[in-house]
Amino acid sequence: MRILLLSHSFNSLTQRLHVELRERGHEVSVELDIHADVTRESVALHRPDLVIAPFLKRAIPDDVWRSVRCLVVHPGPPGDRGPAALDWAVLEGVAEWGVTVLQADGEFDAGPIWSFRSFPMRCAAKSSIYRNELTSCAVAAVLEAVAAIEAGQAAPQPMQAGDPRIRVRGPCRQADRTIDWQHDSTMTVLRKINSADGMPGLVDSLFFQEVRLFDAHEAHDISGVPGTVIAQCEGALARATVDGAVWIGHVKRLAPKSLKLPAAKVFAAEAAYLPHRPGCGYAPIRYREHGEVGELAFSFYNGAMATGDCEALLGAYRAALERPTRVLLLTGGPDYWSNGIHLAEIEAAESAADESWRNINAIDDLARAIIETTDRLVVSVIRGNAGAGGVFLSLAADEVWASDQIILNPHYKDMGNLYGSEYWTYLLPRRAGAANATRITQCRLPMGVAEARRLAIVDRVLSGEALADASLVQSGAAMASDAGFAARLAAKQQRRAADEAEKPLQSYRDEELRRMKLNFYGFDPSYHVARYNFIHKVPKSRTPLTIAGHRIRRAPGRPVGMAVSS
């Protein structure tokens, strides 16, 4: 089928659908919901059999859904209606939630239901649930609906007006989730912050200054006078509740153009007087050992790795190499493996160019340490999405194991033609081949694990229980005890020596950084403009041609909607 994805942004769900539908042979193009007239134009250009709207903030124009079937993904179970479905679900602590695929008609969220999925809720940020459970269920539901439409099934009947499942909820506002520090329990505080995490952030005050709170975690073995800030750890601040405390990892001031940054950095002067309490529930980096398997786990907010994060992870990596293990797992968090350098920290720096340079060198140091590890096998375990330098950092390991639910974005160019580093010019061609490496980095499209496996970017695809910590350790132990381990390690050492003799790692780094220096310090400001627009969420004025295939002028005879092959 020829399918148009109509979305407010090319977010994680839209990317997953783009990948999964193309993988199944559909002709997919994307249009960002910029204006009703632009939507009409995109329908005229692409001539879709079906429009799918994974993420909208307004209704599809009447004349569009009347002329072509439009499916809307609603982040709630059948009968739920309103613009803040997931916010309310997280805030109210429901045990189960769902996602519904319905056909657009004259009433918002009230059209015929083609499919739906349910999932158990966990105590987590709204953005994390959206990126994981909701996205996985939405993809399954959309694919079911598409298959039914392809099979010629008639549209289901809409819910009857008196159906008891119908519940219309308005926006979830600040007043609905304001924290009462003198009465709210730790779990209540977490639900309130989690319900606004991602966007818009929960407004509260710290040190008598209003900020938006993000990245909340339950604190362990810490308590104090409710409402007071009592400790710090790895950039987070602990604030006491009536029955414990919560860690606040990131905050954002209310002033225009403020940035979301580590809480202890925003309030550095105040935090200077607070005790450090490591091991109390906030730990972006952890190391555990299981016999011959070491596991270095890391989880940075939104996958962004600041200079200090890279240096801390490198220190932990070097410490892990001192341990007598045969296999080392580098396990990323449930939301992201890594998205590379920390653009918000760079934007906040006195010199964005200088901080960009420090950050890229810090992540390069980490990548090089992994590449040069020859006394054991290293595995990158990707359980959440990865982008840009984060993808190439994972390739520094001997093997890459990835969840079947993730999306990879192995390219940099969307960030103002950024060239990239992390030794990608060595690592990517070594796995995918030179021609594929060029195509991947130029196409700038999201990649699913099926394609990544075909290109040898991913070595093993994992799902379900195989992603649990115990299963990962078991897989690592099997690798460590394999009869061919010694031979494999020797082959690794020989290949590294041969590669170094052919072209030293330093040469790759020098060449990459020469190009990056132009991005950071050169006359072309594209990187700095793109970074600013990304960090401040400046709305796009048009859909990038890399995903809007219907807007590319094509040679005669070439299908209008065919996206660039990846």
From Swiss-Prot:
GO biological process: biosynthetic process
GO molecular function: catalytic activity
Regions crossing the membrane: none
Pfam families membership: ECH_1, Formyl_trans_C, Formyl_trans_N
Signal peptide: none
InterPro entries from the UniProt entry: ClpP/crotonase-like_dom_sf, Enoyl-CoA_hydra/iso, Formyl_trans_C, Formyl_transf_N, Formyl_transf_N_sf, Formyl_transferase-like_C_sf, HoxX-like, NiFe-hyd_mat_HypX/HoxX
Reported function: Involved in the post-translational processing of the hydrogenase large subunit.
Protein name per the record: Hydrogenase maturation factor HoxX
